[in-house]
């Protein structure tokens, strides 16, 4: 039997980021930053989540001798178009303080190719419909994360993290041609997400936290559709904003 939706959490705490946003963050995070992954089909009540959970525990390294380490990486994929990504990570580890800065860029360009050939019979007449749909989608996403962990005393910890994903000028264009209609549909917009997480744990067992996510995606859609008997044109502005 299936487990339904799976919730991803970080360090045992739910996030106001969506699963897709968390997955995007983890895709761009060095493997060396992850201590372990815990899979639970029925999460305990302390996680405040129903159903299956994947708890990703990030490393919390401290060292008597302070040191700095870094990591860079790239990935290239060739399909119809070239796609690629790159990341750089810089970490500082000390006796009581550890800090981590991550930046990555991910460029994607995808082809859209969908042809429709159908035959419709109305009475004794067969109508042949052929539509050829082509287009592309592209976007360059900038992912950033800055995290700080400070050990105030042996059992007092303060964790702070800022995460963002920004895609300026995300664009999708589709065109359709055939014996039924001629159409063009384009959508453009600037997408951004920002998340702030603060967590404090005291030696008395007190835990206080703040998790806030801001998401904004204003977009413009330009649509034209022409048939033998009609013509449709519209220009629409839309905006999606989330504060939670």
Language model feature labels by segment:
Residues 51, 112-125, 171-179, 219-229:
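Outer-membrane beta-barrel translocator domains and adjoining extracellular loop/strand segments
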Residues 74-80, 94, 105-109, 164-168, ...:
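Transmembrane beta-strands of outer-membrane beta-barrel pores
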Residues 73-87, 127-143, 181-193, 235-242:
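Outer-membrane beta-barrel proteins
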């Amino acid at each position: 039997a299936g487990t339904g939706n799976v919730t991803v959490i970080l360090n045992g705490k739910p996030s106001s980021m969506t699963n897709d946003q968390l997955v995007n963050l983890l895709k761009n995070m060095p493997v060396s930053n992850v201590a372990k992954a815990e899979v639970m089909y029925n999460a305990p009540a302390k996680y405040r989540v129903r159903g299956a959970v994947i708890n990703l525990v990030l490393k919390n390294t401290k060292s008597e001798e302070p040191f700095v380490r870094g990591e860079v990486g790239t990935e290239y994929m060739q399909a119809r178009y070239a796609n690629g990504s790159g990341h750089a990570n810089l970490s500082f580890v000390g006796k009581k303080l550890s800090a981590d800065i991550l930046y990555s860029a991910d460029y994607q360009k995808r082809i859209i190719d969908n042809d429709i050939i159908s035959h419709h019979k109305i009475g004794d007449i067969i109508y042949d419909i052929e539509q050829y749909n082509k287009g592309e989608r592209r976007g360059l996403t900038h992912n950033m994360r800055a995290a700080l962990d400070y050990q105030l005393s042996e059992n007092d910890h303060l964790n702070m993290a800022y995460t963002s994903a920004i895609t300026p000028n995300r664009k999708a264009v589709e065109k359709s041609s055939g014996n039924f209609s001629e159409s063009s549909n384009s959508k453009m917009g600037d997408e951004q997400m920002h998340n702030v997480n603060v967590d404090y744990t005291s030696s008395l067992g007190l835990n206080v936290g703040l998790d806030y996510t801001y998401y904004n995606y204003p977009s413009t859609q330009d649509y034209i559709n022409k048939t033998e008997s009609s013509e449709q044109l519209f220009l629409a502005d839309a905006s999606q904003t989330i504060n939670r």
